[in-house]
């Protein structure tokens, strides 16, 4: 097996994405995200996904030049309509909007729709951690679990992401007691 430097792999991924029409900034974000995820050892959501993305971009089920739309629905809520583009781009935009709202109003909750596979959740929670905020990222997946007594798959195993790079202190005082937990 040949070992390839992350920087070389990143350049190659970006070039591949640009060749199928992905604009440079989005190609750079997706290429960096896929390579970083592989570097973390999450290969199922890393560079391994590139051929899947390229195939879908080529046949048009992911739109290379989609222009996502952000609709602010309240002071701490918004929705990103991805226009059927690259999920990593939309999820990062959603986290950036959530960070902005959290700085302004104390919280930010953003949903993403009309998108595609969004990669590893850790990409987005780390963005929140770098902004010195708590970030929670969730997504859906296909039905894979049959409920007890059932006959067909109904439940999914949605991946959730959290990041604990920064020290986190959770305090939950109640009317009867005070509790604090250091994570």
Positions of the model-derived regions?
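Glycine-rich and polybasic anion-binding loops at the starts of cofactor/ligand-binding domains
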Residues: 92-130
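Generic N-terminal amphipathic, Lys/Arg-enriched alpha-helix
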Residues: 1-20
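Active-site cofactor/substrate anionic-group-binding motifs, chiefly glycine-
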Residues: 45-102
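Phosphate/diphosphate-binding glycine-rich loops and adjacent basic-rich segments that engage nucleotide
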Residues: 144-183
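Glycine-rich, mobile lid/loop segments that gate access to catalytic sites or pores
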Residues: 117-158
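General beta-strand structural signal in soluble alpha/beta enzymes
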Residues: 80-82, 103, 109-114, 135-139, ...
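N-terminal glycine-rich anion-binding loops that anchor highly charged ligand groups
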Residues: 2-5, 22-48, 62-73
């Amino acid at each position: 097996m040949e070992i390839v430097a992350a920087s070389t792999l990143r350049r190659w991924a970006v070039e591949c994405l640009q060749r199928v029409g992905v604009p440079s900034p989005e190609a750079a974000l997706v290429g960096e995200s896929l390579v970083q995820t592989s570097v973390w050892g999450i290969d199922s959501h890393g560079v391994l996904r590139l051929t899947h993305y390229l195939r879908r971009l080529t046949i048009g089920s992911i739109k290379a030049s989609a222009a996502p739309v952000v609709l602010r629905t309240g002071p701490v809520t918004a929705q990103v309509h991805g226009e059927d583009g690259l999920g990593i781009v939309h999820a990062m935009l959603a986290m950036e909007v959530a960070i902005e709202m959290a700085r302004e109003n104390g919280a930010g909750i953003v949903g993403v729709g009309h998108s595609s596979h969004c990669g590893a959740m850790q990409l987005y929670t780390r963005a929140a951690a770098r902004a010195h905020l708590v970030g929670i990222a969730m997504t859906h997946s296909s039905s894979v679990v049959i409920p007890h007594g059932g006959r067909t798959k109904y439940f999914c195993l949605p991946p959730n992401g959290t990041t604990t790079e920064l020290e986190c202190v959770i305090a939950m005082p109640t009317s009867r007691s005070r509790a604090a937990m250091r994570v």
